[in-house]
Amino acid sequence: MKKVLLYIFIFICTLFFNIWVYADTTLELKEPVIVFDKIAHYGLQGYTVAKDKLFVVLEGYDDTKSIIKVFDLNTYKEILSYEYGSLGHANDVTYNSKNNKIYVIASSGSDKVFIFNGDTFKYEKTIRIGLPVRSITYIEDYDRYAVRLIGTGYLYKNDFTLVSKFPFIVGMNLSSEVGRQGWTYYKGLIYYANWSWVSQGGTGTNALFIYDLDGNKYTSIYTDESIGEIEGVDFYNNKMILGFNGYDKKIKFYVSDIPSVEKETKNQEIIKKEAVIVKKKNYEVYIIIGIVSILVIIILVIILRHKKKVIK
């Protein structure tokens, strides 16, 4: 009987520990470093870090106009803002540090990419790359681009010819409830921002799904879901920059430490999903597990005592 109770105790402790550990992978974001009121009929879409500047695209709701904003990442002050014509949905933006160009993708089924100067932040030209990409990131280590369609990703050379006609990643989040946002390469991994689309039946959860360049899923990092819809992720000075369309009608950018990333097993991925539920429901799962565990122990004790009496 003592052994049975010991095993039960170890099981419960392990379960609680795993839930506690993985619930803590939700980033606790502090005050935003950049915040401004939404401009009528415009919302945050893509953005990128260009040297020490943050290049931001606000997309008009009818896709016919856009606003470009540029912020100094050392002071977080706005240094440029101007209205521009259509950049499509402008779902993602990336910066090529080798040619000093900024690339804005039209998205929404288009293969157009708009190129801006990395010093003046002014439009230069439009190119077509052959695929209707929805996310883009420049991979400085290999002088390539990684692009995402819906659930697949391809690699382009620096002249926007395909490295291979086969995708390097397949089967990414295909749920209709998921709002797929921008992605960014950082130190060997791609960080892919997603939002659980409320109007499509989602929960409003914000997440970063992390992959390597072989298409292997590493882990998931969850962010504060009360802020608003996450639009992308980028990096500066070994910190993560997260941008949101806030539920309070403000556009916000947060700076966060980068969590350590290790490749997760399937079991860990399941535990993480449960951990998100725990956080979302104010730890109701803790209470339920506790009650069930206590009931199991009581029932086992009663059964064992009854058997002992029968033997006597």
Which stretches of residues belong to each language-model region?
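C-terminal membrane-anchoring or membrane-association module
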Residues: 297-312
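Structural motif
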Residues: 63-69, 110-115, 151-159, 199-209, ...
